Amino acid sequence: MEEPGATPQPYLGLVLEELGRVVAALPESMRPDENPYGFPSELVVCAAVIGFFVVLLFLWRSFRSVRSRLYVGREQKLGATLSGLIEEKCKLLEKFSLIQKEYEGYEVESSLEDASFEKAAAEEARSLEATCEKLSRSNSELEDEILCLEKDLKEEKSKHSQQDELMADISKSIQSLEDESKSLKSQIAEAKIICKTFKMSEERRAIAIKDALNENSQLQTSHKQLFQQEAEVWKGQVSELNKQKITFEDSKVHAEQVLNDKENHIKTLTGHLPMMKDQAAVLEEDTTDDDNLELKVNSQWENGANLDDPPKGALKKLIHAAKLNVSLKSLEGERNHIIIQLSEVDKTKEELTEHIKNLQTQQASLQSENIYFESENQKLQQKLKIMTEFYQENEMKLYRKLTVEENYRIEEEEKLSRVEEKISHATEELETYRKLAKDLEEELERTVHFYQKQVISYEKRGHDNWLAARTAERNLSDLRKENAHNKQKLTERELKFELLEKDPNALDVSNTAFGREHSPCSPSPLGRPSSETRAFPSPQTLLEDPLRLSPVLPGGGGRGPSSPGNPLDHQITNERGEPSYDRLIDPHRAPSDTGSLSSPVEQDRRMMFPPPGQSYPDSTLPPQREDRFYSNSERLSGPAEPRSFKMTSLDKMDRSMPSEMESSRNDAKDDLGNLNVPDSSLPAENEATGPGLIPPPLAPISGPLFPVDTRGPFMRRGPPFPPPPPGTMFGASRGYFPPRDFPGPPHAPFAMRNIYPPRGLPPYLHPRPGFYPNPTF
C-alpha cells in the first residue's frame, strides 16, 4: 500500500492555483490583508490548507495504527491457526506425495500387465480414491462440525455470560423495584395517614366553623337585642333627662326672675339701710315673730305703695327690712342650694352628654366591629369555601395519586411477576443450556476419544497394511521363484517330450535319472529357510521395538495380515494362466488330490491334452486359493513368522508370539512416516528372479471389513465401502489365461506341491473389544 503522504503531492500545484483564483475572485472587502503579521495571504491560506490536510493524514494514520494494533491479537491467533493448518497441510502433502509415488510405482508395475487387470486396478483405485475422498470429506465435515461445535460452545458460553449479566441486572432491577415498592408502600401509608389527618382536621375545622357561625349568629342576635334594649333605655333616660332639662330650664328662668327681683329689692334695701340703722335695736326685739313679720312684710310689700304714714312706715320698713334680711339670707341659702343643684344638674348633664358621646362612640365602634366581624365572617366563609374547595381538590389529587400509584403498583407487580416468570424461564433455559453444553462437551470428548482411537486403529491398519505389503512382496518373490522353478520343470518336461518323441525307448533311463533329480517327493529348494524367507519386521521395529504383530485379528492364528482385501489372499496367476500354487486341500477331499505326493504316472495323466477344438475342463483348473494367512487356530497373525515349509519351524516361531503380541498391545500409536519407508531388499529379490519375469501388480490394500455384530460388547457398523468381488479385483478369474511366453499349444496344469499349509478362511472376523466402528456420515 502506498504512503498517504505521497498522494497529495502531485495535486499541490493545482490546489495552490485554485486557491489563488479563489482569493483573486473575492471582493476587496472580503480579501484578507496583504501582509498579515508580515506574511502574504496566499502563503497563509496554503499553510492553513496544508495543515488541515496534515491533520487529516495524522488522524488517518493514528486510526490505522490503532486499528492495526487491535488486529494484532487477531492476526496472531489466525497466524497460529494458519501455521497449524499449514503444518497439517505439509504433512498431508508429504503423505500424499509418498502415496502418489507408491501409486506411480504401482501404476508402472500395473502398466506391464493386461488391460483387464488395469481396469480392475483402476476401478479399485477409483473406489479407493472415492473412499479416500469420502473419508477426507467426512474428516473435513467432522472438522467443520468440531469447529461449529466449538463456535456453538463459545456462543453458548457468551450467551451464558450474557444471561448471567442479565440475571445480575434483573436481580438488581428486582431489588431496586422492591425498594421502590417498599418506598411506595411507605409513601402510600404516609399519604393515607396524612389523608386521615386531613379528614380529621377538616371535620374539626368544620365543627369549629359551625360553632363559630352559631356563636356569631347568637352574638349578632344578642348584640342586636342588647343594642335595642340599651337604645330603648337610653331613649327613656334621654327623654327623662330632656324633661328634667325643661323643668330645670323653667326653674332656672323662674329663679333668674326671682334673683332679678331680689337684686332689685336688695338695691332698694341697700338704699334704705342707713335709715334703718337707728331702728336696729327695735328690730332685735322683734325677731321672735319672724313668720308673722314676714307675712306682714309681704302684705306690706304688696301694700307699701299705699302707706301714708312715714314714721309708721319707717318702722314698718325697718321691720320689713329685717324680715327681708332674714328672707334674703334664706334666699341666699336657697340660691346657693339651687346653684349647687344647677351645678349638679350641669355636671349630670355633662356626664350624660359624655355618656351619650361614649355610647355613640361605643355604638360607632360596635357598628364598625359589627362591620368588621361581618367582613371577617364573609372572609371566613370565603376562606371556608376556598379551603373546602382546596381540600376537595387536594383530596381528588391525592385520590388520583393513590389510584395512579395503585395502578403503578399493580403494573409493577405484574412486571415483577413477568420478570420472575422470565427469570424462571431464563434459569430453566440456563439449566438446559448448561446441560446441553455439558452434553456437547461430553460428546466432543467422546468424539475426540473416538477419533483418537480411530486414528490409532487407522495407524494400526496402516502398519498392518504395510506389513501385509512387505509380506506380499516376499510372497511375490517366493512366487517368482516358484514360477522360475515351474518354468524349469516345464523346460525339462518339454525336453522329456522331445526325447520321447525322438526316442521312445529312452523312457526308462530318463525316468530314473529325471525322477531322481526332479521327483516331487524330493525336497524343494523352497523348503529350505533362506535369508529372504525369514521374519521381516518393519524398520522401526528393527531399530527400536521388538517384532510388531498385526493387532487386527482378535484371536486368529494366521501368519499374514488379517485384511481380506489383501491382493495375495486371492488367486495369483503366472504368465501361462496357471495358478502359482496347487489347489487347496479340501478336508472332504481324498489325500491323492493334493498333488504334492502324486506319482509321475498321475502327473502324466494330468498333462493329457484335450482333443482339438475343446477347451480345458474346469476340473483341471485349480480352485480359487483361500487366504493362507487365516487360520482357525488362536495364534496371532503377523509377518514375523518364517516362511519355512516345515511345521516345526512354524511351531517354534509361534512360541514367541505372545511376547510380541503384548509389545504390540502396549504401543498405542505408530508413526505414519515409517509406513512409507522403502524396502531395500526388494530390488535384490526382483533381480534374483532374473529378467523376463513379469511380477503381478500389487493392488492397493484395503482395510479389514467389519460386519455389524450385535452380540459383541460394542455395537459395530459395517464397512464404509463394499467388499471386493471375488476373483476379479485382486486376481484373475478362472477363465482368464494370460498370454504365453513361448510358442506351442497350451499345456495342461500339472500338480505341484503347496508350500503353505491349508487353512480355512472365516466368513466374518470376530469383533475386537478395543476397536470403535467407523462413523456413518
Curated annotation (Swiss-Prot):
Regions crossing the membrane: 39-59
GO CC, any one term: endoplasmic reticulum exit site
Domain of life: Eukaryota
Polar residues bias spans: 530-541
UniProt cross-references to InterPro entries, sorted A to Z: cTAGE_MIA/OTOR
Sequence ranges of Basic and acidic residues compositional bias: 572-591, 649-672
Alphabetical GO biological process terms: endoplasmic reticulum to Golgi vesicle-mediated transport; protein secretion; vesicle cargo loading
Region (Disordered): 510-688, 721-742
Protein name per Swiss-Prot or TrEMBL: cTAGE family member 9
Compartment list: Membrane
Gene3D superfamilies in alphabetical order: 1.20.5.340
Keyword Acyltransferase in annotation: no
The keyword Cytoplasm is annotated on this UniProt entry: no
UniProt keyword annotations, A-Z: Coiled coil, Membrane, Transmembrane, Transmembrane helix
Lineage of source species: Eukaryota, Metazoa, Chordata, Craniata, Vertebrata
